[in-house]
Structures are given as C-alpha cells and as structure tokens.
C-alpha cells in the first residue's frame, strides 16, 4: 500500500464517522515530518510496516475523536511548532491575532507576563519575537507549567515560570509589570451544551471553564492590577465573543479613569479586550 492509498482509505473512515478528513493529512505530515509538498511528492511510495503500524495507531485515536494535535503531540503557532498534550489547550488561530496585537503595544527591554501560560505558546512567542524582553509565565496547573518549560527549552527562550493563581505570584514576589497578556479560562459552565465533543472530552476543563459566568479569572486579574502594573502598561485579554460589554462595564465601575477598547478578530468577532493601565 502506498501513502496515497492509505490516506484515501483513512479519509473514508473519518468521513463515515463524521470527523474532519483533513486531520488524516496532518497526521501523515507530522508523523513523517513532511511539508504538504513533500507529502504529494512521496504519495506513491510504499509504506513500511513500521510506518503503517504508526499511522494506523494514530488513525485509531482520530476515530475516537481525539484532536490530531494531541495524537502527534504538537501544534503550530505563529510559525513555530510547540509540544502539546491533554494537560494544555490546543492553540487557536485567533490567539495569534491577540499575540500580534500585544507585540505591537510593547517595546524591547520591557518586563511582561503571560498569565495562564498553559503550553507556553504566548510567552515563548513573545520572547522569540523580541529577545530583549523579560518574560514571566504563570499558571495554576503544575502539568501545564511542565509543558511550557519544555517548549521554552525547545525554542531556547528564557522564561521565568511561576506557579500560582492569577496575579498572586507577582504580588508575592513584588514583581512590577510593564505589560500583561492573558488568555484565561473564560467559558461559562452554562455553555457546555454548545461545546464540541472533541473539546469537552479531550481538552483540560481547568483551562476552559471559569465560574461567575466565565468572568472569575478576569475579575481576579483586574482587581489586582494596581498591585503589579506600571503606569502606562498595556493590558491585553483574549475574550469570548459575548464578553466585551460586561468587561467594559466592569472597568468603568472599578477603574472609571481607564479607557478600554474591544477589538474584533479576522472573523468579525470580538476577541481582544485591551487598555493601558494608569494609576489614579
């Protein structure tokens, strides 16, 4: 059997169970370490027994609904490849827009933090793009921090990792930040019914769901900003498409002197909640 025949057969199996066929191609490219062009050029090659066994095992996971990124244990983000596993979220394309916006708000030599660092994709991307930054990454999950540390090492990026909830570790260590970015858990428990089966079954709920209709972590972050933020520091949150109005009202209530902004993503959905911190 050659690669083209195997891919065609695997796609038919995926389609029959209602799964995305393109995951098969990603499986082949990642396991063979091929580009799409290389996959096309090699499609007539006969599979070795070892490769066939490897691909069949991967396909068996795909047919159970497991996202291909977890099957191959890696995901692409901002032009780089990162290690992922079920202890961390799979990077979303929309988050690249959030990171791109933040990168345009900061300057080299700043001290910045990624709160809720997860797999480390944001923190590592910041350091890789602007090497002179001092970057902190914090998370409440030990398992997630382990993945983030591996990704920082993989990309030769020095990140200062800390375990803790929201801004508590920064307050405890007296760290002052000149920039803050966070993609925290922001899905409410009430939204479980509209979530994809693959997300609910395989991605970590600790990184997905938050109490108080999804606003718990945002409130904790915003409440403690006065203790850690330097004057003029940019703050950037990734948000759900329905959360911009509430967060705008919350900031107007707690810190009425701060001007906030909600920015849409490429699909026209509210994605970024941002402002520059100013002391009263």
Give the residues covered by each predicted segment.
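N-terminal auxiliary segments of SAM/dcSAM-dependent transferases
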Residues: 1-70
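N-terminal secretory/membrane-targeting helices
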Residues: 5, 11-14, 20, 32, ...
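Alpha-helical elements of Rossmann-like donor-binding domains used by nucleotide-donor carbohydrate transfer enzymes
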Residues: 9, 26, 54-57, 97, ...
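A general structural motif
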Residues: 21, 109, 132, 174-177, ...
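Short, basic/glycine-rich phosphate-binding loops at helix/coil junctions
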Residues: 35, 78-81, 198-205
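Short clusters of hydrophobic/aromatic residues that line enzyme substrate/ligand-binding pockets
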Residues: 39, 47, 71-72, 195, ...
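SAM-dependent Rossmann-like transferase core, predominantly class I methyltransferases
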Residues: 56-131, 135-147, 271-274
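S-adenosylmethionine
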Residues: 138-278
């Amino acid at each position: 059997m050659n690669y083209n025949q195997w891919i065609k057969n695997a796609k038919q199996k995926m389609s029959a169970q209602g799964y995305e066929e393109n995951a098969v191609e990603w499986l082949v490219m990642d396991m063979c370490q091929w580009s799409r062009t290389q996959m096309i050029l090699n499609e007539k090659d006969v599979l070795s027994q070892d490769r066939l066994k490897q691909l069949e095992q991967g396909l068996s996971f795909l047919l159970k609904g497991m996202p291909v990124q977890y099957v191959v244990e890696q995901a692409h983000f901002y032009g780089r490849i990162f290690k992922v596993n079920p202890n961390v979220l799979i990077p979303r394309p929309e988050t690249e827009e959030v990171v791109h916006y933040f990168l345009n708000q900061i300057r080299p030599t700043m001290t910045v933090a990624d709160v809720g660092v997860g797999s480390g994709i944001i923190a590592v991307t910041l350091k890789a793009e602007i090497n002179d930054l001092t970057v902190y990454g914090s998370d409440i999950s030990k398992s997630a921090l382990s993945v983030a540390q591996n990704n920082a090492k993989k990309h030769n990026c020095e990140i200062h990792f800390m375990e803790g909830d929201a801004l508590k570790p920064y307050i405890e260590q007296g760290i002052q930040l000149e920039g803050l970015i966070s993609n925290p858990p922001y899905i409410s428990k009430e939204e479980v019914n509209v979530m994809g089966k693959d997300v609910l079954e395989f991605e970590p709920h600790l990184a997905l769901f938050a109490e108080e209709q999804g606003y718990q972590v945002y409130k904790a972050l915003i409440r403690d900003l006065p203790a850690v933020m330097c004057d003029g520091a940019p703050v950037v949150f990734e948000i759900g498409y329905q959360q911009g109005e509430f967060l705008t009202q919350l900031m107007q209530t707690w810190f009425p002197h701060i001007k906030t902004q909600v920015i849409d993503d490429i699909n026209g959905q509210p994605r970024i909640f941002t402002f520059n911190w100013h002391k009263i």
